[in-house]
Amino acid sequence: LKNLGVKNRSRLFQIPPHIEYLTVKPHMKRYMQVSAEIYGTLLKYVAPEDVHVYSIDEYFIDITPYLPLYKKTPRQLAQMLLDAVLAATKIYATVGIGTNLFLAKIALDILAKHAPDFIGYLDESLFKEKIWYHQPLTDIWQIGKGIANRLHKYGAYDLHGITMIPEAKLYKEFGINAELIIDHAWGREPCTIADIHAYRPIKHSISHSQILLRNYTYEEVYVPMRELVESLVLELLQIKGVTNHI
């Protein structure tokens, strides 16, 4: 769509007139149901402690212990999971394989979605070959426009360019966040799924939201509001949390 002149999050009147399109109302409830079906399918092959639910449609899976179990290579195991999801939901999924969480995410975002088999693979050497000079920087996970513009001031327009900036300057510009930027510029990511599961924040809050397609009356908004509260209560139970404020 970008090649046709449609920017991300464009409004309808901003779409070029020569492009034909359909407007379809979102069905978030159905989206969540399919997401749950996909997650349930994955759990037939891997244990929940080896899965990190990153978003409603993305999961990180540590497949290391399953390679000898299923006697498959990483790509073969990925294909097995893709086939299982397709058979269960009729959804064509994509997979990014990497030797750490960052490389797996980048393999998904930049390589897998353009691969004929919907699978992307990166290790440290392939990262330097295929990703180091990739532009724009905003395609890279966790680099938004603000961070990219600040890096441009130092002449960095790709990850390789970041490695050319003295680390002292990066720490002065970004503070402690420079450590993450530097690690990712070299294709490193020390955090593991086990680390994520073991993390316990000192303060924790949870929230849900729902986009309404029109203005609701008080009576109408009661039902979705109640559903949101009930979902939050269930999430509190899962994390064994308590609250005195909603």
Give residue ranges: language-model regions:
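DNA-contacting surface of Y-family translesion DNA polymerases
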Residues: 152-246
